[in-house]
Design a protein with these regions (language model features):
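Extended substrate/RNA-proximal surfaces in nucleic-acid metabolism proteins
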Residues: 1-120
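Charged catalytic cores and adjacent phosphate/nucleic-acid-binding surfaces used
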Residues: 96-97, 101-199
Length: 199
């Protein structure tokens, strides 16, 4: 990437970022590697509650139906955001993915995440790829959820619209980006096109 940035410096402005987990035991290593590799920003993506060497049964947040696991997700996200290491939070409502009801526990987790993002001025990602995970036959909620964003609108948060790049087919959602930006604007949530400090 650094080579491409130099090669096309007169045509493109390339930034180097990385989505990373939050595991307290590895935070020092993550800081060192970020600096050593010249990574300009980190995106928080909480997918697992711990590493597999710490617990062979480490659970995936997006795969759990447990409300307790949803609370753990919110706690871990808030703790991670408070480190100041991450520029924004990817798929903030990921924990809802396999849940079958948006209940009081889910609402509290959403509120805890939004309150921390507002307090720390860290943008929340409206994850376009999550839109393909809704309306499942098994009744699970999926994500990205309007319920989350309606709660987010009660806090002074900012959003950034993102699209996972796991496979080229995930870019099929790109035509809907403007529609989703309009939805966020209708809720009164400012949508960022660039991250502060990386203009």
């Amino acid at each position: 990437l650094r080579g491409l940035r130099e090669k096309y410096a007169d045509k493109l402005h390339i930034r180097i970022g990385l989505e990373a987990e939050y595991f307290p035991a590895y935070l020092g290593w993550l800081r060192e590697e970020t600096e050593r590799l010249g990574i300009e920003y980190l995106i928080l993506g909480c997918h697992y509650d711990t590493t597999d060497e710490q617990d062979a049964k480490a659970s995936r947040f997006g795969g759990s139906t447990s409300t307790a696991h949803g609370r753990r997700y919110a706690e871990q996200v808030v703790e991670a955001l408070e480190t100041g290491l991450y520029r924004y939070l990817a798929h903030p409502d990921l924990f809802l993915n396999r849940m079958t009801a948006f209940d009081a526990d889910a609402e509290k987790a959403c509120r805890d995440i939004c309150a921390a993002a507002a307090r720390l001025d860290i943008p929340l990602e409206y994850n376009m790829a999550g839109l393909t995970l809704q309306d499942r036959p098994d009744g699970s909620l999926g994500y990205t959820r309007d319920e989350f964003w309606r709660i987010a609108a009660e806090y002074p948060v900012k959003a950034i619209v993102g699209c996972d790049a796991h496979a080229p087919s995930e870019l099929d959602v790109v035509p809907a980006i403007e529609e989703k930006k309009a939805f966020l604007h209708s809720l009164g949530i400012p949508v960022l096109d660039t991250l502060p400090g990386l203009e």
